Amino acid sequence: MDYKHFKGKHANIVIEIISLLEKGVKKAQEILEKPDAGSYTKLENSSGDTPIKADLALDKFLEENFLSLENVKSVFSEEKETPVTKENGSYLIAYDPLDGSSVMEANFLVGTIIGVYEKDYKAQNLAASLYVVFGHKIELVVALEEVYRYGFYQNKFHFIETIVLENKGKIIASGGNQKDFSSGLKKALEGFFAENYRLRYSGSMVADVHHVLIKKGGMFSYPQKKLRKLFEVFPLALMVEKAKGEAFYFDKGVKKRLLEQSVESYHEKSECYLASQHEAHILEKYLKGE
């Protein structure tokens, strides 16, 4: 893989992680392709969810690989109660080994989300983020100074494009229970559909955000506090912001950046809006003051 796009203070750790992913992606694909990969275990993770077999197998594989990196001090999986910590290193990795696992049996797109933090697990310390999506093809997206998209072919990641969101998109991925949506959100969604937006929600956050990014605009929303800050929300918020979009939530009717949120507990959850500029403006218009 050509690493010419990666520059600055955190470039080396990102390159090391990508190198691990490039070497391990075939193994990860093998785990996902096993006939019983989507079968539920009898366990319960720290978030109260029941993981599938592929969740646990990928988690073990990724943890071992991330801990092998010399400059990584701590590794923290969504499946675990607390991080695994080493004596040395500067970086902390928080990851969701298999986002979208609940729809994997339907053969929908799933992926691994990775947040690279410096010194502490805080949004303000997020140095970079990455995700790999597994479908009929495998792709890697990296957020550092900008957002870079790669396709996996002949055992290597090949550069496809630098992703920059346009001002206005054409798709929306609106998750959650609609009966619980606020009146403002319902009006905003009605307005989007009146403008001929297309609904593209799959139940896999990484897949839906990937769709918004590669289509160069749109909106992903999950108004209920269900998504985990460290493992899903912050890494994908950074991805959207670096692509010139907005990542936000509403606090008593006031729009605020997701990446300025505090973290009171490791598995704390948040509402989440990820959008290009036009959609962000519309959402603020209707949800402001609610």
Swiss-Prot record:
UniProt entry tagged with the keyword Ligase: no
GO cellular component, one term: cytosol
Binding site for Mg(2+) 1: E78, D96, L98
Residues given in the record as substrate binding sites: D99, G100, S101, S102, Y201, K226
Cofactor: Mg(2+)
Subcellular location: Cytoplasm
Pfam families per record: FBPase, FBPase_C
Binding residues annotated for Mg(2+) 2, in chain numbering: D96, D99, E232
PANTHER family attached to this UniProt entry: FRUCTOSE-1,6-BISPHOSPHATASE-RELATED, SEDOHEPTULOSE-1,7-BISPHOSPHATASE, CHLOROPLASTIC
NCBIfam families linked: PRK09293.2-1 (NF006781)
Subunit structure: Homotetramer.
Name of the protein described by the UniProt record: Fructose-1,6-bisphosphatase class 1
Species of provenance: Helicobacter pylori (strain Shi470)
This protein's encoding gene: fbp
